[in-house]
Amino acid sequence: MKLFNQLRWFFVREWKRYLGAILLLIIIATLQLLPPKIVGVLIDLIIKKNMHGVQILPWILIIFLVAVIVYILRYLWRILLFGASYQLATELRVKFYTYLSQQSQIFFLKNRTGDLIARATNDVDRVVFAAGEGVLTLVDSLVMGFSVLIVMSTQISFLLTIISLIPMPIMAILIKKYGKELHETFRHAQISFSLLNNQTQEILTSIRMIRAFGLEKNQSNKFNIITRNTGKKNMEVAKIDARFDPVIYLSVAFSNLLAIIGGGWLVWNNQISIGQLTSFIMYLGLMIWPMLALAWMFNIVERGSAAWDRIHSIINKKLYIEDGKNNIPPYPGILNINIKKFYYPNNQKPSLKDIRILIKPGNTLGICGPTGSGKSTLLMLIQRQFNFKKEEIHYHSLSLLEIKIDDWRRRIAVVNQTSFLFSDTISNNISLGKPNASQKEIEEVAKLADVHKDIIDLPERYETQVGERGVMLSGGQKQRVCIARALLLNAEILILDDALSAVDAQTENNILKNINEWKKKKHSLIITTHRLSALINSDEIIVIKSGSIIQRGNHLKLIQEKNWYKSMYYYQQSEIELEDNEKTGEKNL
């Protein structure tokens, strides 16, 4: 029942629908009390020979009309009640998605995709079912049950009613006990379902790697274990679920037995008539549904409550990244970075320390360094993926923490290390951030990203479907489509996080040349790369090692000093020369 209190905000808002449904249920319950009463009266009249066959027909017609009216009214209350519950499903999923879209990187490191999908689908369905069928069964069982009890006790026999209800307290105690067991067992079953979702998602997204390494059997065994465990958990739920109906039917059977014995004694002593006893037995039959409904309601609500706890545990968490209140002036500004120390959550060792950078509009900053040195961490801080101290990063003399996140992210365009494309056309993937872009604009940025020629060679050109995660394109093509997508945003700051790793040196040179022409003193460029040739034209290059800047300057300055940059640059150049010599030798052969 706690769930209904937790959803009170929705019930209060949709009170008209729920009130309408409840009123219709009361009318239905009242109408359903008529047939047993009519049957009892008819039996007494027939026994007394005060009624003939033809006189019965109008009463039968009344019973038929009652059934038709009840059918129509049930249709109407279902529209009212389930219309409201479906609205709840929409709102919960939108709320869940909105919350996820506002979360930072750290949230998704702690919560797996499959589990989040399970909460947004299966758990929401359970909550909605409780808000629909749960409310229905609660109201229907209470209204019908109390109506029947009142008629039985006032119109027939109060004593017989008390005798017949002797098994009910025992049934109520057992149902409450099973309900508590069901809540905990169902919660474990949902956790197991989340694990199954996680495993399925991992297998489907990494199917190429699984096949490449011949891990099909290994992954199949792991999936089989998780599937069996999920089935086992659901079987435990089913076993508890299966206890409800037998308890109810045994209680009803025992109530009928007591009613027949007690009713027979009352008829023998002329305290009630045979017709009244018949009506009483029919009313007792009407009590089967309220009791079943009450047990079913406990079942539904306990499942819904367990599901709500799982949903609420996500959406009730405080956002790790809090939004600012200020808007940015509508023109490019200076990005000032002064990070003394940055620690990842629950990490004692600083990932960045003493990082001081000034990026003016139109400037290019190159970032390089060994793997794991902190380059991507710095870029994530610029994107506000993690929290930092108020004074550490400023834009337009405003701390990034004071700027509205949406406004800031509209000013930056990011191409990450891992290229991500949606299962859509190339055109729609490029125009993702600017849906109203013209075909001319799309083609212009594709040319800047040096991918236009590749696209027009495809059968359907820009309308080619790229498949799941861009599976129909090569790694280099995916990177270039992502670069085109970022360029179309025309953002003040363009960030390329090792976004040219899958293209050859000539293509890289073409793209950087086009980007340098595109930015023309209006846009800033931040580029991280392991291929140092991409940084030659940067206004400033910083070398990060173990989270600190160990060298800085432009390309000409850094190659004149004995340092990491110089040795790595000439090492890479020698590799390129060696590859060129090998290609030349192959041609001569």
From Swiss-Prot:
Stated EC number for the protein is: 7.6.2.2
Q: How does it sit in the membrane?
A: Multi-pass membrane protein
One GO cellular component term: plasma membrane
Q: Can the keyword Thylakoid be found in this entry's annotation?
A: no
One Pfam family this sequence matches: ABC_membrane
EC class of the enzyme, as a word: translocase
Chain ranges of the ABC transmembrane type-1 domain: 18-303
Q: Where in the cell is it found?
A: Cell membrane
Catalysed reaction(s) here are: ATP + H2O + xenobioticSide 1 = ADP + phosphate + xenobioticSide 2
User: Which chain regions cross the lipid bilayer?
Assistant: 23-43, 53-73, 134-154, 155-175, 247-267, 280-300
Q: Which residues form the ABC transporter domain?
A: 334-571
Provide this UniProt record's keywords sorted from A to Z.
Answer: ATP-binding, Cell membrane, Membrane, Nucleotide-binding, Translocase, Transmembrane, Transmembrane helix, Transport
| Domain of life of the source | Bacteria
| InterPro entries (UniProt xref) | AAA+_ATPase (IPR003593), ABC1_TM_dom (IPR011527), ABC1_TM_sf (IPR036640), ABC_transporter-like_ATP-bd (IPR003439), ABC_transporter-like_CS (IPR017871), P-loop_NTPase (IPR027417), Type_1_exporter (IPR039421)
Which Gene Ontology molecular-function terms are recorded? Answer: ABC-type oligopeptide transporter activity; ABC-type xenobiotic transporter activity; ATP binding; ATP hydrolysis activity
Please list the residues that bind ATP: G369, P370, T371, G372, S373, G374, K375, S376
List, alphabetically, the Gene3D superfamilies matched.
ABC transporter type 1, transmembrane domain, P-loop containing nucleotide triphosphate hydrolases
Please report which protein family the annotation says this sequence is part of.
Answer: Belongs to the ABC transporter superfamily. Drug exporter-2 (TC 3.A.1.117) family.
The record's annotation in NCBIfam families points to: PRK10789.1
Q: What is this protein called?
A: Multidrug resistance-like ATP-binding protein MdlA
What organism is the protein native to? Buchnera aphidicola subsp. Acyrthosiphon pisum (strain APS) (Acyrthosiphon pisum symbiotic bacterium)
